A protein has these predicted regions:
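Terminal-region recognition feature
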Residues: 1-148
Length: 148
């Protein structure tokens, strides 16, 4: 098998500029994801008063410890219903991704009732359709954590 060669020059100015720009974008993305977590966590007192776990705590307890969880669609609904980039909360009131439960790779879908009481939006519908299509193609079981 032939070895792949690269023309990327990590020491070049253009590479360094591109890398710096990309890292800034990743930091911004992560700050938007954190906005979603913070918005959900504002309801922690309500969950505790009801004797409930938060959506992320339920997810954490479901997943196999030490195994990866690949979250998907974390930017769904961003600036859709609320066009203000400074206050819009991404995520479409759901946490979805692929993780391992009892050693089995699964699609996990958690309704995040900490955001807008878990109300489904049009974007939530797009997310659910997308992940269910992935599950069919990849033959993944689905676990849906619902709070009603």
């Amino acid at each position: 098998m032939a070895a792949l060669s690269s023309t990327v020059q990590p020491a070049s100015d253009s590479f360094k500029e591109n890398r710096s720009s990309m890292l800034e974008l990743i930091d911004h993305w992560r700050s938007l994801e954190q906005r979603t977590i913070d918005a959900s966590n504002k309801r922690l007192k309500t969950f505790r008063a009801r004797g409930q776990l938060s959506p992320r705590e339920r997810l954490e307890r479901l997943l196999d410890p030490g195994m990866p969880f690949l979250q998907m669609h974390s930017m769904a609904n961003y600036c859709v219903e609320n066009p203000d980039r400074e206050t819009s909360v991404p995520g479409a009131s759901v946490i979805v991704g692929v993780g391992f439960v009892e050693g089995v790779r699964c699609m996990i879908w958690v309704d995040d009732s900490g955001i807008s009481a878990g109300a489904a939006t049009e974007s939530t519908g797009f997310v659910s359709t997308s992940i269910l299509e992935m599950c069919i193609r990849q033959k993944l079981p689905v676990i849906h954590l619902v709070e009603s």
